[in-house]
Structure formats: structure tokens, C-alpha cells
From Swiss-Prot:
Pfam families: TLD (PF07534). It comes from Paracoccidioides brasiliensis (strain Pb03). It comes from the Eukaryota. Residues 343-359 have a biased composition (Pro residues). Belongs to the RTC5 family. This is Restriction of telomere capping protein 5. Residues 173-201, 332-359 are annotated as: Disordered. The gene is RTC5. SMART domains: TLDc (SM00584). GO terms for cellular component: cytoplasm. Residues 370-611 form the TLDc domain. May be involved in a process influencing telomere capping. Its main location: cytoplasm.
Amino acid sequence: MGASQSTNGPGQKTTSVEELSKRLAYRFANKCFTPLELTHLKDNFFSRALDQGGIRYWNEEILSEFLGIPDGAGSAAYVTSDGSLDAGPVIFRMVSYLGAFPFQNTMAPSVLTFEAMVKVIVLLTERYGKVLKRGRKDRVKLLFGSLADVGRRDIVVQLQEAAEDSLELIGEAGPGSDRTFTHPTGFSVDKPAHDDDGEEDDDDLALAALESLDAIEIFKHDQRIDKTVYESKISINTFRRLLALLMVTAPLRPLGTISKYTTGLSSSILETVNEQVESILAALALDDLEGGIGYKSFSELISTSLPYLFDPLTPLFEHLLFSKNLDVTRKRHSQSQNDPAAKPVPTPPSTPPSSPPLSPVILNGGFDSSILNPTLLSHLSFFLSTTAQIPNIFRNRTRLHPVFSSTEHGESLTSFSHHVMTWQAPSILLIKGVVTSESDEEQITTIGAYLPQPWKQSSSNSSRRSSDVPDQSTLPCLFELSPVHTVLQGSPSLSSLKPNMPVTYFSTKTGIAIGCQIPPPSRKSLGADFLPKPSGGGSLLIDPALEVATLVISDGLNGEGVFLPPGISAHSASKSVSCTTLAASTASISASNHNTTKSISIYSLEVWGIIPSQSLSAQLDSPGSFVEKQDAITQQRAQWDFEAREAERRKVINMKVGVGELEEHSGRALLEMAGIVGDSQYSGLRHLR
């Protein structure tokens, strides 16, 4: 790219950044793809590639059309009127940056050649682990750089310049001499700068790539590896368009039809998508909404409350590894018909195996939800983990079973107990209601909690992990989905909390409490001193009538508790040596990061049971174990049948001491007072530790 090369003597070996970039692409191709996948990728790429001066490449229109992404510039321009899904330019900007890896400062934006496409697919599908042994945490920084568009030169101009100069060498090097490089400025987002925050932020991913090529010195000339501050930012419009695309494609499976999620969207679906997108944007600081999203805010948002946000990009770009033009099975079948004497030879599948039929994530039966919808489920998939092996609820085939609905089953703790206390599996609690502000304006809000343990009384902590950093799927989670995205992760020291700090607490007198401190029982009259008290980073209280919910979000000043303050992850909290250190290190990206109490008038309260996939459950069984796990739905129905039989049996108990109707009613009254029959059989205190 406008750089000259020189040699200092016989046998001197010239090394350029472009050559190293190609070497890394070849290594990625050989190590991260199967021969079959590589064949399909080549067919997809070269059958559509443009040619300019001997360079085969893809432009934005080709990429958007192949991926099925709405793009106002090409034939895939089936974008809606509001343009919310017009994400083609955003995706193309991302791949143009990632294609230059690990020399973004020198080569970005790159022409989307075959080598660049190989690196893009490996990075976005996280297949680089087969070549690079470290650097997973640096992926967030890489994604930020690919999205940053504030403070850069026009992307189109740079792409044109890159295409014209793509055959020129960028640098020169020789053994025993200093390596010097002259190259274009590149993106300002990659310029080295001093880090005033004192935060260690090594480019582990890029460093690992150069280590694999024995080219560390060249990397040091390309960019600093010790500390980097990104001066550029992501514009709100760019991030909004990307969020809308990720929201609608979250359920996408490998080899699934992309257009099913990106086209033909109704106005009501677009409205719910935009509501959830704006909720996530509202979690950013006001300064970010004006001048763009800085790296620090972006990194904190992703790492603490949206760890699986970019998961939909994996199946999206895996589409490049399957070509509809290739059908080896059909060719071999025709050959066998021409040669009947040929022996049948077992052959591998000609195409990547298609995904098994996927059961609906939301199971039918019970009731129609007035809260949960596909868009809300996509929002949940960005941060909710139900298994350690495959965290994403769409990838691990998690199913949600309707357990309780206040709209369907009534606003009664008796009904809640009957449906929820008999559910012996993890669950999700969702509440939709209205908050009245000081100006008497009503605002719809949706909150919830992920509870990995069943709602039952248990004095055993054996189900909790005792590791320093517990698996996220075993920790509870308190969250707000709208109007401001807020996530309060479970404390890694959950098992060491006092017995009066259960995850959930159920009482017919005080209602439902999640993440609260429970006062000791007393015979005195019920008062404020005997109500559950908020603790830790957040708590949720629901009155016995299921009419009012109180959400308390704290900055950590309430001491230890079940939940961490917003903006703190379980991993970072495990490194804190004390509650004081944890509170001092709290730096939330959420607008709710201060002591706030929201009183919510409940419109609807729902509980959804979590059912893991049968194949995943089998993998979690210990080796050699043939014990079948009874389905949670079957268990609940068996419990209901048992209770029905017991109730029927108790009806025939003859408590009459004389004759007449009065004695019969007196006998039944005694049974109800004892809690054997009637609604009172569900009374009492039940809690979960």
C-alpha cells in the first residue's frame, strides 16, 4: 500500500505485513475448517466474487445478498420503512475491519478477499481457539474496533484506496536490522494513546496470532500491545441498527433460513424490537448517547450484562461454509447407477449436517403469555445462561414450560403455591406492570428473575458450586428488561451467606421475597420490622395479593446479599477481597446504578419452567450412570395427582360425633384448621436456600 521494499544483502528475506496476514489466513483455513467446509467456502466465495486487476473480492451488495441482511444499497433492499433493519453497511464495515486482523492499524479497512473472509469467519464464529491458545477476552475490543465509526475517514473512500493499492507491499524487514514500516494511517480507532485509567488492556488475541507466526517484532511496530485507548466511538445509529439485527436473528440456527427473521416483519414486531433496542441503549450513559459509545462503556455493557449479544453472528456467518451448488451425494449416486458392479462405499455427507428439528422454545399449553414474546426471548438470550456447556438458550435447545400466570390462575398465593411449589426445576419469574413517576406519568416496565433452583424448602447447599468462580448458570439473576436494561448477577459467594438470606422466600403473610434478608420469626403483631428487608445489590418483594411489586436496586451500600450491584460480573466480584472493595469498584453502565426503589402495579405475573434438552441432560449424567431423569412436567403432574387423591381420600374421613348436618360441618372445620383439606393446606412458610 504505497510502501517500498529493500534488501540489505544476499539471502536477505523480505517479510511484509500482507504476507504475514496471508500466512495467518492459511493457518486458520487449515486448522479451523474441515476440508469439506473449506471446499464449500471456496465455491460460495469465488462463484460470486468480483474481479478487479486480478483481485477477487466481495463488495457490500454481494455480502448482504448472500447473508440475507437488509441493505438499502443492493438487491437485498427489503428493509422496512423505518430502516431499523438496514444493517448491511454495519456488517460490511465490521468484516472490512476484521479482515485486516491482526494488522488493523496498518491494513484496515481491508478488501474482502478470500483470505480476509477466512479470518472474518474464524473470528466471528470463535473458531480461533484451535490456533490461538489465548485471547478470548480481546474479542470484545476487536468487535468494538470493527463497529467504531465516529472519528474515522469515510469508509467508502478507504475501501477504494485499499482496492487500488492492495498488491503493493506494506513493509520491509531483514535479519539483523531494525524493521521499519511505512503505511497508511488506517483507522484512528487503532492509534496508540496513553491510558489515563491505568487499566491493563493487552491485545491478547492479536498477540497470540503473531506469536503463531513468529512475528512479534512486526506486531510491535504495527500497534502497542501494552495499553490502548480507543479514541474513536460507535455512533448510536450504528449500534441501534446492529442491535435490531441481532434481536431478530437471535433464534437463527446453523443453515437456517435468514430471511425468515429479517423480512416480512409486521409493524407490531418492529415496535417490540425497537422497544427492546431502546432499552439496551438506555443502559448507556447520557454522554454516550450524544457523542457516541466509547470503548469503556461498550466493554462494561457487554461483559457485565450482555455477554452473549454477538452469538447470532456465529450461525449467520457459518452459512458461508455450506454451498447449495455442491451435492456430492447426488453425483456419486448417478455414478453408481452407471456402474452397477461398483461396490457401495460408505461416504461422508456431502454437506454439513442440517440442524435437527427444533422444538419451539416456548412450549404450548397451560396459558397464553401476556408478557413473553419472541423479541423478549431474544433479549433474555443475550445475558441468561441455563447451562455451562452451551450458555445461549437458543443454542442449547432450552424449552420454557408455562407454570403459572396470574391472569390465568388468579392473583392468589394459594394458586401460586399450587403451581410453582410443585415445579422441581429451574424457572424464570416475569412481571409486567406500570410505575407511576413523580409527574404522575405511567411507564410500562418489565422485570424478572432467573432462579436456578426449584421453589422448595431445602437445608442443603449441595447443589451449589463451591468454586471461586461459580458457573453462571448455577447463580440466580435479577433483571429489568424495560424501560432500562439492567442485570444484577448472582453473588459468587452465595453459598457462604447467612441462613436468613435465602434466594427466594415464600410466606402467606408477607408474600414473595427474592434476594432479601428475612427477620427472625416472632409472635408479635406483624409490622415493618418483620417484613423482608432488601440486601445486597438488589431485591424484589411482591405483596401477598400479587398486586404490587417493589424492586430495589442498590449501588452496593446495603452490604452483602444474593445479588451483585449492576455493572459487576461474578468473575470480577470473585476477585474482590471484601464487600468494601466490591462496593468501591462498582462502576455500573446502567442508568439505574444508584439506590432506587420502584413500586410496580402488577398487570401480570408469570413463572416459566426451564427444561434442558434431553441430549444435553444425557451429557451431564455421570459416566456409566443409567438413572433416567424424570421430566419436570411429569413430576409436577404426578404431584398434582397425588394431592388430588389425598384430597379425595380425606373427604371420606368421618368426623361426625353425632348425627345431623351441624356435626358434619364441625368436623370439616377441624380438618381445615389443621391444614389437611381446603385452601389452608397450602399455607405456611416455604423458602429456598
